[in-house]
């Protein structure tokens, strides 16, 4: 791909204060996009936005009012919305027998209801601008069951996968593409903490044909491509970013 693949495009990225979201924001800005960093963590979000020359928006993805206010800010500042990245997500690490209903509801609210509301309010803005791209951060757990995660997380990511495909079919007529990406474990500070046990990390790496964890750059680079015009005919795809894990 040539330089500046997202020049002239405006993107709102949720959960972008740190980790994968921050790297997506950095790469999008690097590729010429006007980036809005959406997050509930003001301090970290403002720091990330300032470091790349982006705009921070305080965004609670579980609140429709917060979504409406965020899009209002985008339109006031940039005048258009070309890309929405639904990256925000949570995982309460309990199996189905341990999971209480309140925790289940919390995961549904962030991982499913959040993207639903974001897409709902992004669609008319994208349509008015002649089209757009919606990218949803799912997981390999949105494609297959996996022993390293829990049933509720898998349920939410599976729902997001099918929401993606349904939106892709219905809104293609408006030149709006919708795709999901499905990383395996990504090496972030949180994951490094979880894998302090070398045996546990070795077991995880043993499942991945490429023999390593994904980096945040691996994920962000895939999203740059999917958001760009080079991916103009890619719609409704569930893209694994997993080093071959789901190829077994």
Q: What are the functions of these language-model segments?
A:
Residues 2, 144, 224, 235-248:
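Short C-terminal tail/terminal secondary-structure segment
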Residues 5-36:
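Canonical Rossmann dinucleotide-binding motif of NAD(H)/NADP(H)-dependent dehydrogenases/reductases
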Residues 95-96, 103-108, 204:
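Substrate-binding pocket helix/loop in short-chain dehydrogenase/reductase
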Residues 119, 156, 164:
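Active-site helix of classical SDR
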Residues 124, 169-170, 232:
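Alpha-helical segment proximal to the catalytic Tyr-Lys
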Residues 139:
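Residue(s) in the substrate-gating loop at a strand-loop-helix junction
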Residues 172-177, 234-236:
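Short, small/polar-rich loop/turn modules that mediate ligand/substrate recognition or access, typified
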